[in-house]
Every structure is written in C-alpha cells, then in structure tokens.
Amino acid sequence: MNQEKFKKINKACFLDRDGVLNEDVGYLHKSQDFKWIDGAVEAIKLLKKNNFLVIVITNQSGISLGYFASKDVTNLHEWMNKILKKEGIQINDFFFSEDLPNNNPE
C-alpha cells in the first residue's frame, strides 16, 4: 500500500446544522435566535485539530415556504464563522437545500 498517496487525501466531516450544532428552534435564520448546542464548538475544535475539513449541510425549507430568503441563511452561516473565528477555528463550507421535505428535487 502506498502510504504517500493517503497523506494527500483530505479527511472531512459533514455535519447537519439544526439539532447538531445549534438548538433547533424551527426555521432559524436570525443570529439572535441562534444557540450553540453544548459541546458543538468544542467538537469542531477537535475535528480541526485532527485536520478534518468541517462542512455543514442543512435543509432550509423555510426558503421555499417564503419565511426567509437564501441570503438570510448565508448571512447566518457567515455570522457562525465570525463567532468561531474568535475561537481560532472556521467551518470550511456550508451547503443548504431549499427543498420541502416531501419535494422531489430534480
């Protein structure tokens, strides 16, 4: 087995947002409603310390329902990284879907 080949591979951890990193308050899109789940920031620190890429994935059906805009979600994610930067860490990327739970995306 070629060990050098594996040294170049990135490790990644994909985390859901609501209910994993923050308390699920329903249709979260404002920083003032955001509350970290106990241990979430520490878990991200541990992942980063062990050279993992940290990627957040989340379904944001509130966009399709008209409760908020995709820019609101992007702003919240930027705010999350601003808070994490104070802890010396960052989430590498965020991805979200606007689909409703029973929708069949194409």
Name each model feature, range by range.
Residues M1-E106:
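HAD-like aspartate-dependent phosphatase fold
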